[in-house]
Swiss-Prot record:
<dbReference type="GO" id="GO:0006772">
    <property type="term" value="P:thiamine metabolic process"/>
</dbReference>
<comment type="function">
    <text>Catalyzes the ATP-dependent phosphorylation of thiamine to thiamine phosphate. Is involved in thiamine salvage.</text>
</comment>
<keyword id="KW-0418">Kinase</keyword>
<dbReference type="GO" id="GO:0009229">
    <property type="term" value="P:thiamine diphosphate biosynthetic process"/>
</dbReference>
<keyword id="KW-0067">ATP-binding</keyword>
<keyword id="KW-0547">Nucleotide-binding</keyword>
<dbReference type="Pfam" id="PF01636">
    <property type="entry name" value="APH"/>
</dbReference>
<dbReference type="GO" id="GO:0005524">
    <property type="term" value="F:ATP binding"/>
</dbReference>
<protein>
    <recommendedName>
        <fullName>Thiamine kinase</fullName>
        <ecNumber>2.7.1.89</ecNumber>
    </recommendedName>
</protein>
<keyword id="KW-0808">Transferase</keyword>
<comment type="similarity">
    <text>Belongs to the thiamine kinase family.</text>
</comment>
<dbReference type="InterPro" id="IPR011009">
    <property type="entry name" value="Kinase-like_dom_sf"/>
</dbReference>
<comment type="pathway">
    <text>Cofactor biosynthesis; thiamine diphosphate biosynthesis; thiamine phosphate from thiamine: step 1/1.</text>
</comment>
<dbReference type="GO" id="GO:0019165">
    <property type="term" value="F:thiamine kinase activity"/>
</dbReference>
<dbReference type="InterPro" id="IPR014093">
    <property type="entry name" value="Thiamine_kinase"/>
</dbReference>
<dbReference type="InterPro" id="IPR002575">
    <property type="entry name" value="Aminoglycoside_PTrfase"/>
</dbReference>
């Protein structure tokens, strides 16, 4: 269901106009991006998502809806409704753990995603990193950040190993263990890109866990494990800068201390690695 109303509505207006029998239940706790709430009617639940990023064009939010509309139920919740500024998606009943699932299970899930038809829009990290630099708190801009940004822009993004649809925000809180298996939620950063970029961006605990995931994926995809790991390492500097920039970006938007702590820790990691 899609509305043609071009004016963003409040949550109460959305409920009264399109979901009159539903009432707010609890805020969605998964992920760091916010902008979600759960609405309920009797035992039936729906996730209502708001376009919460004032610096992102409306087209990005529409892409999120299109990605969910395109993906099979074996990967993601169904898209139920869209109007400018809001969408409603299926609520997935299941268990959410902060830890990632077993490497073989996660590799199979990501390989299943990467076998799907492409979304139709490419993930471009260089302009995104530049946006984070320009939109962050000016007091947080450092010569170190600028040098790293210019070096990446000079080198250019790695040549893709394989192009596929990517989720690009894979961590424990975005994976639901349902009665039918693992599903991914929070697809707002989805787009087409290198499979190794997806693997580089997974929020792993350490290099050992990262290598286990890479080896398991290589077995699924019948790719040489050493070649895949080399490609993941090529993307690693981009991913670390992406995370640092996103934390800075969200700090400027929200003022929430968790983002500045995460940004500081990520910058420390970058400085230690030179």
């Amino acid at each position: 269901m899609r509305s043609n109303n071009n004016n963003p509505l409040t949550r109460d207006e959305i409920l009264s106009r399109y979901f009159p029998q539903y009432r707010p239940a609890v805020a969605a706790s998964q992920g760091l991006s916010g902008g979600s709430c759960i609405i309920a009617h009797d035992t039936h639940r729906i996730v209502l998502r708001r376009h919460h990023d004032p610096d992102a064009p409306p087209a990005h939010f529409l892409r999120h809806h299109r990605a969910l509309s395109q993906l099979p139920a074996s990967l993601a919740p169904r898209a139920l409704f869209y109007t400018p500024g809001w969408m409603a998606v299926e609520y997935l009943h299941g268990v959410v753990n902060s830890a990632l699932p077993d490497a073989d299970e996660l590799a199979a899930l990501l390989y299943h995603l990467h076998q799907q038809p492409r979304f139709g829009w490419r993930i471009a990290l260089s302009p995104l990193l530049a946006q984070y630099w320009s939109c962050c708190d000016p007091a947080r801009r450092t010569p170190f950040w600028l040098r790293r940004l210019k070096q990446l822009q000079k080198n250019g993004e790695p040549r893709p190993l394989r192009l596929a649809p990517l989720h690009m925000d894979v961590h424990g809180d975005n994976i639901v263990l349902t009665s039918a298996g693992l599903r991914l939620i929070d697809w707002e950063y989805a787009g087409d890109g290198d499979i190794a970029l997806e693997l580089a961006a997974v929020w792993v605990e350490d290099e050992r866990q990262h290598r286990q995931l890479a080896n398991a994926y290589a077995a699924c995809a019948r790719i040489d494990a050493r070649q895949l790991w080399r490609q993941i390492r090529l993307w690693h500097p981009w991913v670390i800068m992406l995370k640092a920039g996103w934390f800075e970006y969200r700090w400027r938007q929200t003022g929430e201390q968790q983002f500045i702590r995460l940004a500081d820790e990520t910058w420390r990691q970058l400085r230690m690695k030179g």
